[in-house]
């Protein structure tokens, strides 16, 4: 795992325990309590699913500088969170988020682009 300078991790943050080397966190990032960052997914942990139909995913996660992940966020494998983007409480991010965006919901969706005047 790579962590930049001046980052703040609140209690109970979980960063992928199996592939932590696939997680990169930029400078000045804040991660709220009970947030989870996964660099892999393993749908075949369910014995009733056929492994060929649901392959294991292992992919890098990149959280760029200045991003804020509010409490309870889940970031899935292969996602990039853009610079200075804000992920709202409890959001589940399954796809890349551009720079300077506000994301809400499950699945997470961009609801606002932050102008440079607001930063």
Give, region by region, the residue ranges found by the protein language model.
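Extended, small-residue-rich solenoid/repeat segments and analogous flexible loops
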Residues: 1-7
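Flexible, glycine/small-residue-enriched loop-and-beta-strand segment within the central core
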Residues: 9-80, 106-107, 113-115
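Flexible glycine-rich beta->alpha loop in the catalytic core of nucleotide-sugar glycosyltransferases
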Residues: 42, 80, 91-92, 98
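Conserved G/P- and acidic residue-centered "switch" motifs that form tight phosphate/ATP-binding loops
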Residues: 87, 105
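Short helix N-cap motif at coil->helix boundaries in the Bergerat
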Residues: 95, 112
């Amino acid at each position: 795992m790579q962590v930049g300078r001046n980052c703040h991790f609140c209690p109970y943050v979980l960063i992928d325990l199996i592939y932590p080397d696939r997680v990169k966190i930029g400078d000045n990032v804040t991660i709220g309590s009970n947030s989870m960052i996964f660099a892999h997914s393993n749908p075949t942990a369910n014995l009733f699913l056929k492994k060929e139909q649901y392959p294991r995913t292992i992919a890098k996660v990149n959280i760029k500088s200045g991003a804020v992940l509010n409490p309870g966020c889940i970031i899935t494998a292969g996602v990039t969170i853009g610079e200075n983007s804000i992920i709202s409480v409890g959001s589940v991010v399954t796809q890349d988020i551009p720079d300077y965006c506000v994301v809400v919901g499950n699945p997470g969706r961009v609801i606002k682009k932050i102008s440079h005047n607001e930063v």
